[in-house]
Structures are given as C-alpha cells and as structure tokens.
Curated annotation (Swiss-Prot):
Biased composition (Basic and acidic residues): 95-104, 117-138
Pfam family, one: DEAD
Residue stretches in coiled coil: 286-333
Residue intervals of the Helicase ATP-binding domain: 373-556
Amino-acid positions noted as binding ATP in the UniProt annotation, renumbered to this chain: A386, K387, T388, G389, T390, G391, K392, S393
Name this polypeptide is given: DEAD-box ATP-dependent RNA helicase 48
Principal EC category: hydrolase
InterPro entries: DEAD/DEAH_box_helicase_dom (IPR011545), Helicase_ATP-bd (IPR014001), Helicase_C-like (IPR001650), P-loop_NTPase (IPR027417), RNA_helicase_DEAD_Q_motif (IPR014014)
Amino acid sequence: MGGGPRTFPGGLSKWQHKRMHEKLARHKERGLLRHEKQLYLARLRSEIRASRLPAAGASPPDDGDGPTSSRAHIRALADRFLLPGAEDLWNEDDGPIHRADRPRPPRRIVSVGGNGGDRRKLDSTKQELPRGGKEPRLAAFNPRRDFQTAAPWWWQWSSSSAIPSRTKEASFCFFGPKRSYSVMPLFQAHQESSGTSMVPLIARGLASARIAPSQLNGERFYSFAAGRFGRKLRPDSSDEDDEDISTAKKDMRFARFGASSEEESGYDELEARSAIRKKWSSAALRNCDMKKERRALKSYEEENNDLAGSFRELREEIKNREVLGAERRRYESRGESLFTNKRFEECGISPLTVKALTDAGYVQTTVVQETALPMCLEGKDVLVKAKTGTGKSAAFLLPAIESVLNAMKSHTNHRVSPIFSLILCPTRELAIQLTAEANVLLKYHQGIGVQSLIGGTRFKLDQRRLESDPCQILVATPGRLLDHIENKSSFSVRLMGLKLLVLDEADHLLDLGFRTDIEKIVDSLPRQRQTLLFSATIPKEVRRVSQLVLKRDHVFVDTVGLGAVETPTKVEQLYLVMPHELHFHMVYRLLREHIDQEVDYKVIVFCTTAMVTEFMYIMLRDLKLNVREIHSRKPQLYRTRISEEFRDSSRLILVTSDVSTRGVNYPGVTLVIQVGVPSDREHYIHRLGRTGREGKSGKGILLLAPWEEYFLNEIHDLPVQKSQTPNIDEEMKRKVDGSIKIVDMSIKEAAYHAWLGYYNSIGDVGRDKTMLVDLANRFCKSIGLEKPPALYRKTALKMGLKDVPGIRIRK
C-alpha cells in the first residue's frame, strides 16, 4: 500500500474528499427541494384556476370572474411597469401593423346612398364620402378593417366656417407620411328604422355635431377635448339622439387613465374589469410578482399625536441639556474637579458592590457616573457621551451587576444558565480590561461570574470554559461572539434571557466596519431588554444609526456639553510639520528630550499601520530605548502580556497601532506621539485620551508631513498649537540612519505596502493616485529602500493603481 498518506483524485486528502462529497450532496438536495417547490406551486396554480372554471353545462359567470386569458395575463404583467400618472398607449383591439412591403388589403365596396336609386359603390380604401347630400350607411362595414392614413393626420371639412349638418357635403384631406393600421370601426350601424345615421365626428366637427350615444356601444374612440383613451360600455339606447354637444363630449371619453369627478360614475364596470385582471394575474403568480403598495398616509389625528410626541421629547432633551450644562458649569467653577460630592452609597446599588468599590479606593462618583447612573438603574435606554478617563466603565458595569441581581431574584428555573448582561467592545485589550474591572466589583458577590470572548484564542477552549463555568456577565468582541452564536445553538438559547446590552466605544462599533456584525448580534437578542451606549465621541451619523439598538424614547446624556472641548483640559496639545523623510529622526529626538525631562516617563507612540509599528519598534530598540510593541500582527498572548507590563510599569515606551486607541486604561502616561495623519477626528481624540486620565496632566504631539496639514481643519476647534521645530544634529541623524539600515528588508517592503494601502483608503489623499504613488516613493526612501517594492497585480487592481506611473507590478 505504500507508506505515504492516502490521497484521492486531484491530490485531495481524505477529509477534503469527504467535505467535497458532502458539499455536492447538499447542492443536490437543494436542487431537489427547489424542483419540488416548483411542482407544488404549479399544482397550486392549476387548482386555483380549475376552481374558478364553470361547471360542465353551466353558463359562464356574468361577473367576469373566470380564469384569466393569456392576453389578459400579459396585460396585467405589463401594468406592473406602468408608472403612476403615465399615459398608456396600449390598444387591445389594435391588430398587427402592416408594413409597406406586405400586399395591400383588397378593396371593400359597400353600398351607400338614400332610399331610392341614388345608391353607388364606395371604395373604403380611399375613404371618400358620396356626393349628393346623403351620409353613408355604416351597417355594411365589417367589424375590422385595414386602411392607410397619413401621420400626422386630421379631417378637414370643405367649409371650415360652416357647421356640418346632415345635408351638407363633407370631405376630408390627408397629408404626411403614410402609415398602415388595423383598427376597429369607430361607429356601428344604426337601425334603419330609427332614421338616424352617423358620420365620424372628430376635430372641428366634434365641436358642433350631434351624435347618438347609442352608436358608441362598446367601441373605442378619441376625444380631442377630453384628451383621454378608454372603453365606454353603455346599454343600447336611441332616446338621446337630440342631446346637445356637451352631453356628447361627456360620453365620448377613453377611461384608461382615470376620470374627473363627473366622469367617475360611468366607469364602475371598467374599474371592476381591471380589478379582476389584476386579481387573477396575482393569483396565477401566487402573489410573488406584485407591486409593492404605497405606505398609507397618516391621518390628521395620528400626525398631530406624532408631532405632539416629538415636541415633548424635544422639550425633555432641552431640559436635560440645561441641567447637564448647569452641572458642568458648577464643576468647572470648582476647578475642573473630576469627582462630585455624591457617594456610591447614595446611588441605590448593592451594599456588596459599594464595599468592593471602597476596597478599591472609590468612594465618590464622577460627573458621568452621577448623571448616568440614576437613568441606567431605572431601566431606560441611555446614550452617554463623556470625555476619556472620566469613569465611563464603572457607569455601565454597575448597572450590569444590578440587572443580574434583579434577574436572579425572580427565582425562575432555566434549563441552561442564562446570560443576563452582555458588554460589547471593539478591541481585545479593552475586553480583557473590562473583565478585570468587573471581577473587582464582584469581589463580594457569590454566584455571579464574568467571562470574556475575544479573538486569538481557540474556539473549543471558549466553548469548554463557558460550559464548565457558566457566567451571568459576558464581555466580548463582535467577531468572536458572532462565531459562537452561529456555530453553537445552546449559546443562542442562553442569550434569550438577556436583560442588558452595553456597547462600549459605541461610535466605533456602529461604524461601517462593525455594523454588519452588530446587526446580526442584535437580531439574535430579545427585544425586551435595556441598552446602554457609551463613547467619548458621538458624531451625528452615530446618533442616527444608534436607532438600530436603542428604543425611540431613549435618553441622551452629554457630560461634555455643546461647544465644549472634547479633549482633557489638562493635556497640552502640539503639532509639528516636517518632511516625511525626517519623521523617524524627529520621533527619536522627541523621545530623548522627554526622557531627559521626565524621571518616571511613560510614552505611547501611535503609528498608522501594524507593519510601520514593527518597523518603528525595531529602529527604536536598536537605538537602546526601553521600548515595547503591540499591534494586530502579534498573537493574543503576547499582546496581553505586553499590555499588562506597560500598565504596571513606568519608564517604558509603547509603540502601537490603533488596537490601543480606544478605552484601554494605562495609568500615568506622560506623552502621546501620533506619527502620521489619523484616519479621522475621533481617532485623534481617542489616541490623545490615553494621557491626562483621571484629571491628571499630560502632553500630546501630532507629527505631520506638509501634505497632511489638511487634517488641522478637522481639529480646528481643539486647543492644538504649533510647536517650534527642534533641531536634529548630524550625530543624531547618523545614528538613526544606521538603525534604519539594519531593519530586515521584508519588514521594509511590508511597511511600504501597508503605508500605501492606509493612505489610499483616506479620501483626501487617495483621490489623486499619481500624487499618492509619488508620496509612497518618498516614504520608501525614508525607510532605506532604493526603489519601491513591486505589488501583486490583484493588489494593484483593488487599490486602483494598476496603470499609475511609479507602481511596479510583480510578474
């Protein structure tokens, strides 16, 4: 048999071969189910049509409620694409158009004339009227005739000033290109006994002629005055021959496109017939191909109620803003104090939780806690905006614990242990931090557990941990939580008992990157729940999208205030503008200067991408600085270890990407350096918020290239000042260049590709591809590459850089 592993055709392994056949079996099963569904629908349609057929020997129903014909079915399908108010030129009695190359129809000779011998033959194809003062008898005309006309055409009486009468000789003229038509006659013959005959009355003749409405039984006509097309169904009558022209014009209408108020009474039968057609066409299609009905307009009372409710909500929001503004001014007058005079014992929370807070050193509430806790504990949906480092985590962890305690008091028996509180956060580091803080608050609570679900760990281990150690509070990232919901049915059952949903850093979770996952998660949660949203920045778009998870009567708590600065007031904000080739030299210069000034320094350096972060870390490490790195390319165990080390240490530098931007609490950070333009204003605020926490002082420096100065317009309302450019001596420049050279070539190429992708995604830079490639080539030289690395063809196509000069394509 051989000693190697067994393979199947195509080089597949045993498991690949098995999965392939399982996939083919599922595909075949879906096809059989689809075919069976089609047969069922066809049989159902046949039964519906058969049930509407008249019984054998019975007369067809007189209400026209029988099965639809093929012509009516096609007509109903075409009506679906007719826009409201458009004119329909469909004429069901029109036949096929005869082209010029077809033989002309034979002439029809009919007899016209009076009662005596004054009768002669009339050629119907020439459309002439006999001479002699007599009108033609139309009884001999066939119900269908073919003739040629000119288009455009109209009839012209021989004497335009005279009124045509029954004794007056009339003629009509044609001019224009010929067209062939096959139409039904406009008028049928009248009974000879009535002594009345008709001539076609159109254009000017209609204005003064008298007609008998009995001549118009079930036929089509055109009215210049009304401008409508339609079908008029009237009973035969000969008593109205002497009506005036207004009655005649009123009766001569086409009703295909509706009628005025005086016309509506005569079209009941036509509307009934149209309704029958639509009804049977939809039945044949089993309601699968119907137009969507327009939303009905609200009544006057409903509009007034909605308007009154909107005004009531607006008054409440204005009142809340005034209260919050007064409180904010009171705290500002006390000197920007973070804590208030209110103690946690006065907030109505569990004494065991208060005891745990006291042991941790927290006795008084902060501004956001004092404002948001009463509303959260009342069970309302709340959207909270507060500055970074003001105690938002405790403001939603305390209501989460209280919701679990209230749910456990009900003593309801559950088959599985339910999850009462769910906390979602965007990053793994933030989830780990919130889990640790929740464990501190649950120190004296017995029987309440908290766990975290984050990426970077084994899925089976998470399942085993959730089953062996059930929890009531779950902290998770959206991606890993969605994996458990979709792959583990028992986990979805546990979420059915949810009482509280919390979205920390809600603006980021409701952004385009996470919105799809959040929508799927919310769909799997019970609707009867409380939802809390917390963030330091809440743009207008997030306020609008927040309706996906919040109730309509939710409360918006803004502790920042309108027109207030969103960044910590004790943090000094500076920016530097330098050529991109000197950015790495300037970072080293700023770090050396800060280390000399601060004894217990603690610095965070934010880079644009993960690979640029790794490049910066290797360069600074070679320059003998005490530096660590965290970015998305590192395994989760490494990231957790470095995060804990940086949190508990001082005299340390952390080089990181945006994974450390939001929510992570690193106490005692003295300096934040942002290298390159942030992706948006919110990222700048959250990065800067890593320093100046809990009311302490700090410093932030933004390092930009000359072509990145556009970003200053987005933060013009923040107290950012331009700093004096420090000098870089030759010795320092030589040392940095030497450290750049020792970085591995693969890391440099990866940094170039990542830099190009990042700035290509920023609209202000990525619009001009030629300029973007030129800037990328400058960055390439700044990291020690002589020529830009080649891109894969697929990557260049995705980025829109395939034919841009300066881009090298890998062959």
